[in-house]
Amino acid sequence: MSYYTNEQSGGEKKTRKSSSSKRSDRKDSASSSPPPPGAVRGRVMYPPGYDGDAWLSRRERRESSGSSDSSSSSRDDDDRRQPEQQPKAQSTRERRKSQTTVTTRRKTDRGDGGKSSNSNGPWSIDNQCANLVKRLSLAKGFGPSATPASDSDRWRTTTNPANRSAFVQAVSVTAMAQGELAARAAWEKYKPRNNEDLEKLVETLEIKITVNPGRGLWDVASNIASAIRNGQPITHDLLYASSPAGDGARTSRRQSCRSKSMPRGDEEDERDAGSPRPPSSRRR
C-alpha cells in the first residue's frame, strides 16, 4: 500500500507538472504569435525617445517639493497666526475697557439740574473736543435740543447733557476760530525768521479771546464748522455770518441791547422832533 501511495503521489506530481507546462506553452505561444487585427495588448506603447525613469523622477521631485512647500507654508501660517492672535486679544481687551469707561461716563454725566458727583471728572473739555471732531466729520450743525414742547418746559432725561454738550462745542468752535485769527495776526505782525524769534514770540504772546456771538451762536458755530470741513479759510465774516453784514451785526446787537436797557421816555426823546409819530405809538 505504501508503494502504491507513493506511486500515486508521484503520478499526481507528474500530472501537475504537465498541466503547468501546458499553461506556460500557451502563454509563450500567445506572446510569440502575432495579435489579431482588432486585439489590443495589455501594455502602454510609449513614443520613441521617452524615458520613464525621468518622468518618475520629475513626479517624485514635484511631490517632494510640494510636500516641503506645504510644510513650510503651514509653518509660516502658524507663525503668522500666533502674533495675529495676540493683538486680537489685546484689541478685545481694549474694547471692553473703552466700553466700561464709556458706560461710566454716561452714568456720571447724567444728572438733574447739574447735580453731579464730580463736576470736573469724566465730563471735561477733552471729551467735548472728541465729540466736536466727530460732529465736524459727520457734517452736523449746532443747535439746542428740540425735545421740549415750549421754551419754559423743564429739561428731562438726556436733554440736559445734550444741550450742555452742544453749548460747549459751539463756544469752543467760535473760540477756536477767534484764536486762529489772532494767531495769524500776531504772526504777520512780528514775522519770526528763526527759532529764536519764534521762542520770543511764544514767550511774549498773550491772546485774549472773548466769545460774545449773542443769539447767533448756533449759526456762527455751524458756519465755522462747515468752513473747516470743506477746507475753506476762516475769516472774520464767519464770526458774524448770522446777519447780512459783519459790521452791522455788532452795531445792531449793541443797539438792541441799548434799547432794552434804556427807558421808554429816553428812547422817545432821541427821536427827531420834526418826524411825525406813527398812530400806533401815541398814548391815549
Swiss-Prot record:
Residues 74-83 have a biased composition (Basic and acidic residues). Residues 115-126 have a biased composition (Polar residues). Highly phosphorylated in the host cell. Packaging is selective for underphosphorylated forms. GO terms for cellular component: host cell Golgi apparatus; host cell nucleus; viral tegument. It holds the Pfam family Herpes_UL49_2. It is found in: Virion tegument; Host cytoplasm; Host nucleus; Host Golgi apparatus. Residues 94-108 have a biased composition (Basic residues). Residues 1-126, 239-284 are annotated as: Disordered. Interacts with gE (via C-terminus); this interaction is necessary for the recruitment of VP22 to the Golgi and its packaging into virions. Interacts with gM (via C-terminus). Interacts with VP16; this interaction allows the formation of a tripartite complex composed of VP16, VP22 and UL41/VHS. Interacts with the capsid-binding protein UL16. Interacts with host CGAS. Belongs to the alphaherpesvirinae VP22 tegument protein family. This is Tegument protein VP22. It comes from Psittacid herpesvirus 1 (isolate Amazon parrot/-/97-0001/1997). The gene is UL49.
